[in-house]
Regions:
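Gly/Ser-rich, low-complexity
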Residues: 4, 8-104, 108-127, 141-156, ...
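Membrane interface segments of multi-pass transport proteins and intramembrane proteases
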Residues: 115-120, 154, 219-235, 333-342
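Small-residue-enriched core segments of transmembrane alpha-helices in multipass membrane transport
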Residues: 125-135, 156-165, 193-199, 230-244, ...
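Mid-bilayer segments of alpha-helical transmembrane spans in multi-pass integral membrane proteins
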Residues: 129-141, 160-177, 197-205, 209, ...
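Generic multipass alpha-helical transmembrane bundles of integral membrane proteins
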Residues: 183-306
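Helical hairpin unit composed of two closely spaced alpha helices linked by a short loop
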Residues: 298-339
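Interfacial loop-to-transmembrane junctions
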Residues: 336-356
């Protein structure tokens, strides 16, 4: 009888613990659903559909999936996507590379035949003909790549603008009012820097750099070499400075804002504990809601980061393939063709590298802005 009584006591205690755990799970799920209902996923999804027109991506569905299993890489498989993008970019550049390779061969053949004639007129005429045709093709392709890059960055800025109010609300609900304000202010500053500095100044400087580099190779006397070096230094300096300054400002402010939020949360919980009779219950519910809000905020941020990565992956791979193609063609042309043609191709490859660096700078700025906020109270 005594043994049966002990079994009933322990069995009842375990049942109560299980019921309490189930109740807490239900309360957490209810709190998550209530917080998710306050977020505007429709406007975000419209911008995601515009940004990822060739991919099917559900923003709200990904957030809910992360809330359940917490694995962001289950919905984002980058390996096959990168290979597919590289293959598509290579096929897109294949025609241009064939034409430029034919121009390189034509320049080499014409240069060999022109050496049989007296004087430099025939050789110079053949060189200028080939060089100007190659220059026209390079500038046309580079202009198209620059316009595509500008459209991608503009779409990324529009996505971050739509994302900001909902992410601000999620961060504020997580008990991080000061952190949410910091995020809002810093994101506006990052968007301003991207639009007014990177798009309005750095991108045109890259185009000017390539044009001057091509003209410099055309003259053959290096009369504009210092100008190209100056532009390259300015572009690289502006990209590095913008990244360092903006990220540094966020890191410094992130040392203060989370501490203020933590102090306010602690004061609120201590006040709730002092309420007679229901203090512990209120404190438990408050901690549950705060934990759910932090989880939603971080899942929301990770989903936004996945969208940014998916949106920037295709143009980044395209620019990388284009730059490598021009560099390889320049290396192949140097032994058989005029050094100015090889220099022209190498300058185009360097221009594509600058475009890629610009895109990566924008991506890193947005990703770190989200990651710094998501890292608080994690």
């Amino acid at each position: 009888m005594a043994l049966l009584f002990l079994c009933l006591i322990f069995g009842t205690g375990r049942t109560q613990k299980i019921e309490a755990a189930d109740t807490e799970t239900d309360q957490a799920a209810a709190a998550q659903d209530e917080l998710l209902a306050e977020l505007d996923f429709d406007a975000i999804q419209q911008e995601v559909d515009s940004l990822l027109s060739s991919q099917q991506f559900s923003f709200a569905g990904t957030v809910r999936s992360l809330l359940q299993d917490g694995d962001p890489f289950r919905t984002f498989r980058a390996g096959n996507a990168v290979l597919s993008c590289a293959k598509t970019a290579f096929l897109a550049q294949k025609g241009l590379m064939k034409e430029l390779f034919l121009f390189v061969l034509a320049g080499a053949v014409l240069g060999s035949f022109s050496s049989l004639f007296e004087g430099k007129q025939v050789r110079d005429a053949s060189f200028y003909m080939v060089y100007l045709l190659a220059l026209a093709l390079i500038l046309k392709n580079f202009q198209s790549s620059g316009e595509n890059l500008k459209a991608v960055i503009t779409s990324l800025v529009a996505f971050m603008r739509i994302l900001t109010p909902s992410y601000y609300l999620a961060a504020a609900a997580a008990g991080g009012a000061s952190s949410a304000v910091m995020f809002y202010q810093m994101l506006l500053l990052v968007i301003l820097a991207v639009e007014k500095l990177l798009l309005a100044l750095v991108l045109p400087m890259i185009h000017i750099y390539l044009l001057i580099a091509l003209v410099n190779d055309l003259s053959g006397e290096e009369i504009l070499s210092h100008m190209t070096e100056l532009l390259e230094t300015c572009v690289n300096g502006l990209l590095k400075s913008s990244l360092g300054v903006l990220v540094g400002m966020q890191m410094i402010r992130n040392l203060i804002a989370p501490a203020l939020d933590s102090l306010r949360q602690m004061a609120l919980w201590r006040t709730a504990e002092m309420i007679p009779g229901i203090g512990n219950a209120v404190n438990a519910v408050t901690e549950l809601v705060a934990g759910s809000a932090v989880l939603i905020r971080n899942c929301f941020g990770v989903t936004a980061m996945l969208v940014l990565l998916a949106a920037g992956m295709v143009p980044a791979v395209q620019l990388l393939v284009s730059g490598l193609s021009f560099r390889l063609l320049a290396a192949a042309a140097q032994p058989v063709s005029d050094k100015r043609i090889a220099g022209c191709l190498a300058a185009a490859g360097k221009g594509y590298a600058m475009l890629l660096r610009l895109l990566l700078t924008v991506e890193v700025l947005f990703l770190l802005t989200i990651a710094i906020l998501a890292g608080t109270f994690s």
